[in-house]
Design a protein with these regions (language model features):
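Residues forming the flavin
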Residues: 1-72, 109-286
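Dinucleotide-binding Rossmann-like beta1-alpha1 core, especially the glycine-rich loop
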Residues: 53-105
Length: 286
């Protein structure tokens, strides 16, 4: 969110003075010691390179880009669905201009519709969407290209953590971890996953009313790629919804990473797992 906000501000008004604060490192310096093969287990880095830095928590993901309002957030609570889809297409155009693929998977193909009918026989409901798989390595390349595009147009301050935000003199005063203070007229906060708890405290300090989103508890299961090839070759990732018979609880499949790799994440000392999947066949698992 912060990167694309900076991109759009510079596109609309290149004369603006924009400073982007990032607690992690630049896109070229980010490196998880597990992924680099230096260690086997998470060593609790003070700032997790998988979660923080230019590109955020998604920088090393498998790079799925979904064209849908059926899942992926609650933007339609604030913007009409047609406008949301226009914005999704607009962001995709930015990505394509910086090297993203134009190949798209869809639930509208004959194969996908046959898959949806078969799923209904088991009371599984396939959500409708188009999806691009950018690939972990291509995702990184796109972000590097965007960084090269922006680095001389606005100011990035890496390894810079904010501690407090306060209203002051018609703007905002941001206090940094090293004690420095920055004043700005307008402030856009994009704390990402790793900064969610911190930002909750900031909002309370500013007297903002908060709402709780639902929390999904997920289990990552590693299987041979051939088990789900009949699905992933057609739609790449299927969002299948099922409601349990006794209590009506909703469960779903999500975050498929065909031929992928399970990776560790560290969110303020809490270890979780994610999945990476490369576009290059030579980098895939089985």
């Amino acid at each position: 969110a912060g990167i694309y906000a900076g991109y759009e501000l510079m596109r609309r008004n290149p004369e603006l003075k924009v400073v982007v604060l990032e607690q992690g490192r630049d896109i070229y310096s980010r490196s998880c010691p597990i992924v680099a093969g230096k260690v086997k287990d998470c060593i609790q880095c003070k700032v997790c390179d998988t979660m923080c830095g230019f590109g955020g928590a998604g920088a090393f993901s498998d790079g799925k880009f979904n064209f849908t309002t059926a899942f992926g957030g609650w933007l339609t609570d604030f913007i009409d669905p047609g406008t949301v889809m226009e914005l999704i297409e607009y962001v995709d155009a930015i990505n394509v201009a910086h090297g993203a693929t134009e190949e798209v998977y869809s639930t509208e193909t004959a194969e996908a519709k046959a898959l949806a009918r078969r799923a209904l026989g088991y009371d599984l409901h396939l959500l409708q969407a188009r999806c691009k798989h950018l690939g972990t390595e291509k995702n990184l390349m796109i972000l590097q290209n965007i960084y090269e595009d922006l680095k001389n147009k606005l100011e990035f301050r890496f390894n810079t953590s904010a501690t407090t935000i306060a209203q002051a003199d018609g703007g905002y005063l941001v206090t940094l971890k090293n004690g420095d203070e920055l004043f700005c007229k307008y402030l856009l906060a994009a704390p990402g996953r790793s900064g969610a708890e911190w930002f909750s405290d900031v909002c309370k300090g500013l007297g903002l009313h908060l709402l709780n989103n639902q929390v999904d508890v997920g289990v990552r299961v590693e299987l041979p790629a051939t088990v789900f090839e009949h699905i992933t070759n057609v739609v790449y990732e299927s969002k299948l919804i099922y409601r349990t018979k006794q209590y009506g609880d909703q469960v779903r499949t999500f975050c498929m990473n065909p031929y992928g790799h399970v990776v560790a994440e560290n969110v303020e000392g809490i270890n979780t797992v994610n999945g990476h999947s490369y576009a290059d066949p030579a980098l895939r698992s089985e």
